[in-house]
Amino acid sequence: MVFINICMKIIQKIIEIIKSLFKKEEPIIEKEFIMENQISKNFTLAELTYSDTAKSKGLDNTPTESEYMKMKTLCEKVLQPLRDHFGKPIRINSCYRGKQLNEAVGGSKTSQHCKGEAADIEIMGMSNYDLACYIRDNMDFDQLILEYTENIKNDINAGWVHVSYVSPSVNRKQCLTINKSGTKLGF
């Protein structure tokens, strides 16, 4: 009996150690802070972390401090300059996704959304093709993808633009198109 008790304590300790290895950083902020935090002139933390899927499934989509800082950089280097240039609101379809949310929406395991480095965006009344071309020609970025736009030059309501930003020394300036036919380089 003593041997069994010792074995149980050892097993419990091993489980605690394993759990600590996979433990995510603690969220940086209280939920109230998310609702009020203005990351840049026109973007809030609430809109960058909001997800209908997270809400309906009861998933916590609170970023860590590191993820928050990367979203702040994305706003400073890409989203806010776009908003300032076009003078129109930018619709954020998806920005930050915690691991559980990313799995729930079928996102890539290496998705930059999980790091706070990417956003799927649109500007109402503007074709996503034109938006992507402007970013490609005028901004620093890591990855730029025209997603699910079958007739990209003519249908302003089709798909969205995925844009990510890491840092000037790491950004790849990779341009892709993804649609029903597959993935190709460029637009």
Task: Kindly give the residue locations of the regions a language model identified.
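Extracytoplasmic cell-surface/polysaccharide-interacting catalytic and binding patches
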Residues: I11-H85, S167, I178-F187
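Catalytic cores and adjacent binding grooves of peptidoglycan-active enzymes
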Residues: K115, I123-F187
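Amphipathic alpha-helical interface surfaces
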Residues: L74-V78, K88, L101, E117, ...
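Active-site microenvironments of hydrolase-like enzyme catalytic domains
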Residues: S108-I121
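Extended, low-complexity, intrinsically disordered C-terminal regulatory tails
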Residues: K77-G106
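Extreme N-terminal basic, low-complexity initiation segments
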Residues: V2-I4
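A residue-level signal for beta-strand positions that form part of recognition/binding surfaces
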Residues: N42, P89, A118, W160
